Amino acid sequence: MAALTLQSVKKTYDGKQFVLHGIDVDVADGEFVVMVGPSGCGKSTLLRMVAGLERISEGSISIAGKVVNQLEPKDRNIAMVFQNYALYPHMSVAENMGYALKIAGVDRAQIQKRVNAAAQILELEALLQRKPRELSGGQRQRVAMGRAIVREPAVFLFDEPLSNLDARLRVQMRLEIQRLHARLATTSLYVTHDQIEAMTLAQRVIVMNKGHAEQIGAPTEVYERPATVFVASFIGSPGMNLLEGRVSDDGAVFAVAGNGPELPLAGVVSIGREVAKGREWTLGIRPEHMSPGQADAPHATLTVDSCELLGADNLAHGRWGKHDVTVRLPHAHRPAAGEALQVALPAQHLHFFDPASGRRAN
């Protein structure tokens, strides 16, 4: 195992415009770090640079303290698991898993030993003689992971490995990857656009946007204290409600822009010196923190436009001024369109962002 270090890593294709803007990341020995972001944010490009499939324009990448910028992928002691399983259709499961070792000249007994050990970890023993066409999608992905495990790499790289699976299989495979990391404790860098994968798998999350690492932190930190408006809107399903407006001169209310209501801030501003009174801010609050019935929190009225019934809970939708607002409600609470909903504004769950920079203020 080994630490993975990225220092001021940049990427440009034309020498003028950068698609990655100085990424600094330290992945500790045995740590599982997930890069998450929308399509085109640079996460897969960065992973390919770590793998050696893309050249680095500036900066350095080190594995186990050794700079690998100029090394070929085969010399970096890494193993990749892709979105596409990339299994040889004419080979058995065992042959697929051991093929890279065979090419590397590892003796047959050692290959068999490693393949059997990986098959036991992944519960593939009964499938070793089958061909890929005889396997389910989840089984094929386990074979792809087994092929990576037998190499005993310093670093695992995962490039959206669950994207081809249906929802049920994704849940199952997330659990299997968690168990796999708990058992092997191999340094891992995982790329996904799915925030659920990021939040459930990661020890730390890197939220990527337009070639920048917007925030790096534990899943709870990224959820509870988003560093930017982008992180607030991207992490969470649905994302945080973000309202443009102005804190009053006395700090008592937040006037929502676009002829929206004045939201009570009783006990809030004491928001601190960072959030000045009498100026414009972007106020954020998550749908799940607005549920009615919180007796000790200020409340405001939201007229319901529609309600989505999700099973375990419901989402009520309305508008304050020019802003769409979503509130997560318990399963039994199903307001009708036109109903006035008294939603909570608990002080500890209000987030203030600078409208110019998008950075967190409080």
UniProtKB/Swiss-Prot annotation:
Transmembrane segments: none annotated. Residues 4-235 form the ABC transporter domain. One of its GO terms (cellular component) is ATP-binding cassette (ABC) transporter complex, substrate-binding subunit-containing. InterPro entries: AAA+_ATPase, ABC_transporter-like_ATP-bd, ABC_transporter-like_CS, ABC_transpr_MalK-like, ABC_transpr_MalK/UgpC-like, Mo/tungstate-bd_C_term_dom, NA-bd_OB-fold, OB_MalK-like. GO terms for biological process: carbohydrate transport; glycerophosphodiester transmembrane transport. GO terms for molecular function: ABC-type glycerol-3-phosphate transporter activity; ATP binding; ATP hydrolysis activity. ATP binds at G37, P38, S39, G40, C41, G42, K43, S44. Keywords: ATP-binding, Cell inner membrane, Cell membrane, Membrane, Nucleotide-binding, Sugar transport, Translocase, Transport. Signal peptide: none annotated. It is a peripheral membrane protein. It is found in: Cell inner membrane. It comes from the Bacteria. It catalyses: sn-glycerol 3-phosphate(out) + ATP + H2O = sn-glycerol 3-phosphate(in) + ADP + phosphate + H(+). CDD domains: ABC_MalK_N. Its main location: membrane. Pfam families: ABC_tran, OB_MalK. Part of the ABC transporter complex UgpBAEC involved in sn-glycerol-3-phosphate (G3P) import. Responsible for energy coupling to the transport system. NCBIfam families: PRK11650.1. Belongs to the ABC transporter superfamily. sn-glycerol-3-phosphate importer (TC 3.A.1.1.3) family. The complex is composed of two ATP-binding proteins (UgpC), two transmembrane proteins (UgpA and UgpE) and a solute-binding protein (UgpB). This is sn-glycerol-3-phosphate import ATP-binding protein UgpC. It comes from Paraburkholderia xenovorans (strain LB400).
